[in-house]
Amino acid sequence: MQNPQNLIWIDLEMTGLDPDRDVIIEMATIVTDSDLNTLAEGPVIAIHQPEEVLAGMDEWNTRQHGQSGLTQRVRESTVSMAEAEAQTLAFLEQWVPKRSSPICGNSICQDRRFLYRHMPRLEGYFHYRNLDVSTLKELAARWAPQVRESFKKGNTHLALDDIRESIAELRHYRDHFIKL
């Protein structure tokens, strides 16, 4: 059921950090209510890329995505960038009205840059604001290091796992850093 207070969480895995050269290889979304309770998990999509694109990844991405199994999932996938965008939009339209939710996640500006370049319809679905958990992480590191250090991430670099960790991290900062 659509609710303008719901939040859209997204994470992308890419072949690198440059949206003009690199591409999205995995995406996932979660919708939460405003209290960070998960309402629905969207499709987790490995996006097919040709072998020459995968061969162009740097050492870190080659190792990380190879070890996680993502590179193989991308090779085996038949889902195009356009199909992934359409599937994700169809999911989000059930839960959140267009342009009502900020884009939510960790270092979310990077994801937004890739969406703007490769999935402009999806990028346009979000409100122009960002809810970036990394802002609180940076503030906690400076103002309350014990709070920052008390949250440990798994760092699987798989899209759905990363979103779940971002939501848990924001809950952690809400409970231990932000005085409500």
From Swiss-Prot:
This is Oligoribonuclease. It is an enzyme of class 3 (hydrolase). GO terms for biological process: DNA metabolic process. Keywords: Cytoplasm, Exonuclease, Hydrolase, Nuclease. Residues 7-170 form the Exonuclease domain. Belongs to the oligoribonuclease family. Its EC number is 3.1.15.-. InterPro entries: Exonuclease_RNaseT/DNA_pol3 (IPR013520), Oligoribonuclease (IPR022894), RNaseH-like_sf (IPR012337), RNaseH_sf (IPR036397). Its main location: cytoplasm. The keyword Coiled coil does not apply. Pfam families: RNase_T. 3'-to-5' exoribonuclease specific for small oligoribonucleotides. One of its GO terms (molecular function) is nucleic acid binding. One of its GO terms (cellular component) is cytoplasm. It is found in: Cytoplasm. The active site is at 128.
